[in-house]
Swiss-Prot record:
One of its GO terms (molecular function) is zinc ion binding. It comes from Phytoplasma australiense. Catalyzes the attachment of glutamate to tRNA(Glu) in a two-step reaction: glutamate is first activated by ATP to form Glu-AMP and then transferred to the acceptor end of tRNA(Glu). One of its GO terms (cellular component) is cytosol. PROSITE patterns: AA_TRNA_LIGASE_I. A motif ('KMSKS' region) lies at residues 214-218. This is Glutamate--tRNA ligase. Monomer. It catalyses: tRNA(Glu) + L-glutamate + ATP = L-glutamyl-tRNA(Glu) + AMP + diphosphate.
Amino acid sequence: MNKIRVRYAPSPTGFLHIGNARTALFNYLFAKHHQGDFILRIEDTDLLRNVADGEASQLKNLRWLGIDWKEGPDINGPFGPYRQSERLTIYQKYAFELLEKNLAYRDFEKDKKNFAIRFKVPPNQTFTFCDLIRGKLTFLSKEIEDWVIIKSNGYPSYNFAASIDDHLMQISHIFRGEEHITNTPKQIMIYQSFNWSIPKFAHMTLILNQERKKLSKRDVNVCQFIQDYADLGYLPQSLFNFLSLLGFSPSSCKEILTPQEIISLFDVNRLNKSPAIFDKTKLDFFNNHYLRKTPIDDIVSFIKTKLDFFEVLPINNQKWLTKFILLFQERINYIKQLKDLYHHFFDKNTSLSEEVEQFLKKHDCALSVLTLFYHKLNLVVFEKEAINPIIAEIAQNMKINKKNLFVILRIGATHKMQGPSLALFLELLGKKQVLNNLSKIVELLKNQ
């Protein structure tokens, strides 16, 4: 097999979309599996759609995901430049060759001055290629009109520029979305016109939401861009793992895989023909798995980069913040959920729910239990190492169902029936707040 060279060629029109990230990742995995080259090329010839910082955001998001490239706009290589806007003379050269061969013609506008160059679609011809995922695909030339290769502004069309670049950059395989299938016969026309070898194509399936509809901005539960997930506190390794399984069924019996394991397992023969389903629940499961293994200091660093969002947290109290993260680390699916958990569990103005009041009414022992709990907590240094023995002592001495007892203690100290590890939670709430909570419940029970 000749040297494997693949490319990801985004347009700088905004942030890195989920679908494009999957395309980049599959190209990257294929190259790495075969010890080949992964190339980044910027297709910036659609001037009206290009946005400021579009290229920079693409590069930033790819690197965040863990995808690097051997050649690209920021890494010199032997086949540059790697921005199409810097290759205009190359496209014009090949367009004029086609004019000279009578395989293209000038299509003048009404002013008779400006013109586009159109490719002459050969009559009565069949274009067939073997897609690595879908098998044999055939197109008839009679179904394709003469198409523009150079626009009147001198810029190339997508299909023309991509074909020229893929040949000159020695691209051997092209992995892309199925929406590009209809572009393939036009690109084959260019290869055949110059007697160039045709790269192998693999058109990946669409990514659908759980209603089996194409992802759209109306999907409120699914963020569309990689940057959104980074901002929420999803980890790059979880996105890498999750995206790699959207349309790929590895031979491994497990789903949690390291990048190196995925590279080793990646096999074009195991790419799916049916659409991939974006399962947000599975992504959250993956991210929770990786968050559990993430050093606390890394989560603290993330929080400190989002001060405007986490302003409610006592950011400057490193000891408290570390314990707070430890308390909830195994419960969160992404880091920004910590803010919601803080509001839910540390809001000092919460009122008792009807469920809590009904529970207390059913347990006559609650008053004596919570009175004892108050007095014992009032005597100790407020750390979990001192609080845990008190809870254990009360549980041992009170002849009450243990499950109900712990709920009574939690309600008294936190005003909630459920929550994280009680002793550490109380330490973080602080002695003043916990004793105040207990006092309110004790008074309520006395007055019933």
